[in-house]
Design a protein with these regions (language model features):
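Anionic-ligand binding patches
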Residues: 2-8, 14-33, 37-197
Length: 197
């Protein structure tokens, strides 16, 4: 059996955990959900960049558990909104907002914006912290357009309103295997794996 690397996923977001575990399986790694550990303090995402939040999560979790940890911060950058919601993507409609509340607020803010000006990207920054080593940071992006109506039932977050012209589908219409080829998280993971080879 090949040597498998164990890494704590510094997130409680189950959508991200599932996606990371599919990506980890391809690389021979094992991602351990933060939910499997009792008493781990919540990491406050108070940085103003994806990299700052990803590093903070990975460093704090790795230090607390004395294990390798992978921090992720990702979000949606909408050009017509000057990059918003950005690092506030998960809280766009409020601190405890649901995914649907967030994308509904986004659609409302873009009501008067033409289709050509609804360009956006999902961006992901990963930070891998291994005790005693320098952090490794990678980024990935997936370009698209914000649709006017939601479509699809796969995925999470803003996936139902994120249209990918090159695939002629919404992110939420992609099967996991398709998403793992083109998503911002998959691209950041591929870059990370290249760095640590």
């Amino acid at each position: 059996m090949p040597n498998r690397k164990k890494v704590v996923l510094a997130t409680r977001n189950q959508g991200k955990v599932k996606e990371f575990n599919r990506l980890f399986a391809e690389a021979g790694w094992e991602g351990i959900s933060l939910a499997e550990f009792d008493g781990v303090p919540e990491v406050v995402e108070d940085k103003d960049t994806f990299e700052g939040n990803a590093l903070k999560k990975a460093i704090e979790i790795s230090t607390y558990l004395n294990m390798p940890a992978l921090g992720d911060d990702s979000g949606l950058e909408v050009d017509a909104l000057e990059g918003r919601p950005g690092v506030y993507s998960a809280r766009f409609a409020g601190e405890d907002a649901t995914d649907e509340q967030n994308w509904r607020k986004l659609l409302k803010e873009l009501e008067e914006v033409s289709t050509q000006e609804r360009t956006a990207r999902f961006r992901c920054t990963l930070a891998l912290v291994i005790p005693g080593e320098e952090p490794i940071v990678s980024t990935g992006a997936c370009e698209g357009v914000i649709a006017r109506e939601p479509k699809g039932t796969n995925g999470f977050g803003y996936d139902p309103v994120f249209y990918i012209p090159s695939m002629d589908k919404m992110m939420a219409e992609l099967m996991p295997e398709e998403k793992n080829q083109i998503s911002h998280r998959a691209r950041a993971m591929q870059q990370l794996l290249e760095i640590i080879k």
